[in-house]
Amino acid sequence: MNMQILWIIIAIICSYLIGAIPFGYIIPKLFKGIDIREHGSKNVGSTNVLRVLGAKYGIPTFLLDCFKGALPIIIIRYMLGMPELFLISDTYDISIVFGAAAAIGHIKSIYIGFKGGKAVATGVGAVIAINPIIGLSGIGLFFIVAFSTKYVSIGSVVASFSVAVMMWIGVLIKEIWIPVPNLTISYESQIINLVAISLIVLLIIYMHKKNFIRLMNGTENKIGQKKIQNITK
């Protein structure tokens, strides 16, 4: 097997394993002694943690989920200095693949029976590693929308969609990727990566289908609406 392909496969597996770390399960279990899978939407993600336990535990979970989406790309692109892992050729960057692997790990975590969250924070974290301004704007937008509407699901979908739009606009003004030393990333490569990002966003939106139904029925829980009694105090 070509060594480049082997390294890419190894990096994808490692990215998945990092993304699969279930902070949405660990934090409620560690600090409140509860299994988040038995509360709220029973989803293992920062959205459910924020809804069930409030901002004190939801925000750290969200940030850690972001971090695990960014970490694989940061390690491979900037710390290891191994361009052969994210370049198909001299100008084709595939680093978003590792962020996508982390997002899939979050959705289907091997550590908790292939259950997980909806990959909003993890996907945004991957974007931060590529373009911090757009990624951080996505996080800011999430909190603004979520806390103004009191619906985490609305904040998640709006932020995810907005990040994809901002990334596409970035391509048009040719400011999408952070430069990698001594490498020139092609415009075509940017388009390929943006298609991948768009597919991730579509997956995130699809994962919220039950939330859309509850919103239409008026049964979607608001932030802090149904905190667990005697636990959140």
From Swiss-Prot:
It is an enzyme of class 2 (transferase). GO terms for biological process: phospholipid biosynthetic process. The keyword Transferase applies. It is found in: Cell membrane. Keywords: Cell membrane, Lipid biosynthesis, Lipid metabolism, Membrane, Phospholipid biosynthesis, Phospholipid metabolism, Transferase, Transmembrane, Transmembrane helix. It catalyses: an acyl phosphate + sn-glycerol 3-phosphate = a 1-acyl-sn-glycero-3-phosphate + phosphate. Probably interacts with PlsX. Catalyzes the transfer of an acyl group from acyl-phosphate (acyl-PO(4)) to glycerol-3-phosphate (G3P) to form lysophosphatidic acid (LPA). This enzyme utilizes acyl-phosphate as fatty acyl donor, but not acyl-CoA or acyl-ACP. This is Glycerol-3-phosphate acyltransferase. It comes from Acholeplasma laidlawii. The lineage of its organism: Bacteria, Bacillati, Mycoplasmatota, Mollicutes, Acholeplasmatales.
